[in-house]
Amino acid sequence: MSERFHLSVPVAALVAAIAGGATIAGAWGFELIAGLEPCPLCLQQRWPYYAGVPLAIAALALGRAGRTRGAGIALVAVAAVMAAGAGLGIYHAGIEWGIWEGPSACSGGGTIPRDASRLLESLGEGRIPSCAEASWRFLGLSLAGYNALIASALALAAASGAHGALARRTAG
């Protein structure tokens, strides 16, 4: 891979930190402001961002301190967790499109209690949204689909920066 085709450590780390932070802020915004309740898989898709954003910030700090190898390793970790996030997004989008079945925890709904006292108790429990129903779509893609695209792009950006950092380190 030519030197001109990969990102520098600071650029890759900033892209991952800023875009990752904006993505997780958007997820929280859809939940808290727009009122879209996340399903169990939606919540799991946030985990790579919770890990990836601090790792990207660490990569930036290591790079600025001249620790290129450490920054490269941190970016490899960012790429790995974002690739896992992309996989979760693809899996979730596939469930929404009916390509495969989701886990039983994602069935949504629930049973209606037959006992009147249990019915009153169940009123405060709330409904778990189904992973198979996209709560929002734009241009045909659900939030899970957009997460798959964003996480893939962040994984590629981090891998590009890691390649540049580690290739320079081994070449020099």
Range-by-range predicted roles:
Residues 36-50:
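Loop-to-helix transition at the N-terminal end of transmembrane alpha-helices
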Residues 97-142:
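Extracytosolic (periplasmic/ER-lumenal) interhelical loops and adjacent juxtamembrane/interface segments
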Residues 6-18, 62-86, 156:
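Interfacial segments of alpha-helical transmembrane regions
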Residues 56, 75-89, 106-114, 151, ...:
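Hydrophobic alpha-helical segments of small multi-pass membrane proteins
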Residues 125-172:
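A hydrophobic membrane-anchoring alpha-helix module
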Residues 22-31, 83-99, 117:
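C-terminal TM-helix exit segments that contain a strictly Trp-centered aromatic cap at the helix terminus
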Residues 1-8, 168-172:
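Membrane-interfacial, low-structure loops and terminal tails that flank and connect transmembrane helices
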Residues 58-66, 159-166:
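Structural signal for the C-terminal ends of transmembrane alpha-helices
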